[in-house]
């Protein structure tokens, strides 16, 4: 009897839902496990933001979780955890090693030289982001991008713009597979009204990370120039964030 198709995943911090990459990995892995694949996620060690009960959870919705050595210092957590995840993936019995994001892809050569098929998903051109525009981080991430081009058997991108970038910059073909969404469940907005005093169709919601590349300042400027009685709503004072970005 043939063993189940085995896949290793790394690049995420940990499951379940810490950020965009973690959500993608969770949704992908649970579906693969449901379809009969043996999926192992190599996560960062350390405290889980969702609560202590997740810290050493070995299995999550059919996904095997393993926690790798992580140096808890700024700039080293992602590098160290990605290195050890790549090392375990390289020596493990996996058919495919699936790496998420450009930084972790720096180590794509490691499973590749040991005969593994390597897939890299590019979630964005990370070295262009404001927080990585200078210093070691930017150089490391950009080299990760180049290593993905050189060593990955397949590259997945989430947007046509990134697909064009890889084609124009490296002449590399990629697979355009945008993120999907689960079918939403419609609920009455009673809690929103009760907690925030907001009613249906009375507000414009900003939902996203509060980082410069999201362009919140443009939203605020546009809102200031629109005649409306709607409220502009965010997870914190997005006006304050926008003002900070402009300074």
Feature names for model-found ranges:
Residues 161, 180:
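Carbohydrate-associated surface elements
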Residues 87-90, 113, 137-155:
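Membrane-proximal helix-turn-helix segments that form the acceptor-binding/catalytic region
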Residues 117, 127-147, 187:
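Nucleotide-sugar donor phosphate/pyrophosphate-binding loop at the beta->alpha transition
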Residues 1-47, 92, 224-226:
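N-terminal subdomain of nucleotide-sugar transferases
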Residues 8, 156, 197-214, 220-225, ...:
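Conserved donor-binding/catalytic core segment of Leloir-type glycosyltransferases
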Residues 45-47, 181, 207, 231-247:
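Glycosyltransferase donor-sugar binding loop
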Residues 76-90, 94-127:
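An aromatic- and histidine-rich active-site surface loop
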Residues 53-55, 186-198:
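A short helix/loop element that forms part of the nucleotide-sugar donor recognition site in Leloir-type
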């Amino acid at each position: 009897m043939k063993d189940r198709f085995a896949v290793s995943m790394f690049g995420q911090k940990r499951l379940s839902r810490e950020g965009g990459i973690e959500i993608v990995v969770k949704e992908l892995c649970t579906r693969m496990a449901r379809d009969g694949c043996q999926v192992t996620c190599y996560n960062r060690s350390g405290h889980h933001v969702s609560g202590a009960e997740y810290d050493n959870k070995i299995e999550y919705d059919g996904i095997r979780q393993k926690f790798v050595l992580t140096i808890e210092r700024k700039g080293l957590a992602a590098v160290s955890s990605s290195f050890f995840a790549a090392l375990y993936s390289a020596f493990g019995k996996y058919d495919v090693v699936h790496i998420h994001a450009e930084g972790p892809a720096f180590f794509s050569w490691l499973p590749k030289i040991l005969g593994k098929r390597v897939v890299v998903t590019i979630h964005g051109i990370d070295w262009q982001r404001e927080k990585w525009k200078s210093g070691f981080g930017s150089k490391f991430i950009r080299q990760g991008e180049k290593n993905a081009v050189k060593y990955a058997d397949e590259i997945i991108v989430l947007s046509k713009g990134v697909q064009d970038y890889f084609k124009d910059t490296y002449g590399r073909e990629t697979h355009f597979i945008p993120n999907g969404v689960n079918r939403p469940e419609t609920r009455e907005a009673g809690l929103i009204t009760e907690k925030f005093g907001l009613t249906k169709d009375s507000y414009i919601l900003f939902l996203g990370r509060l980082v410069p590349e999201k362009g919140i300042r443009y939203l605020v400027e546009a809102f200031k120039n629109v005649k409306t009685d709607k409220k502009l709503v965010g997870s914190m004072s997005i006006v304050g964030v926008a003002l900070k970005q402009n300074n």
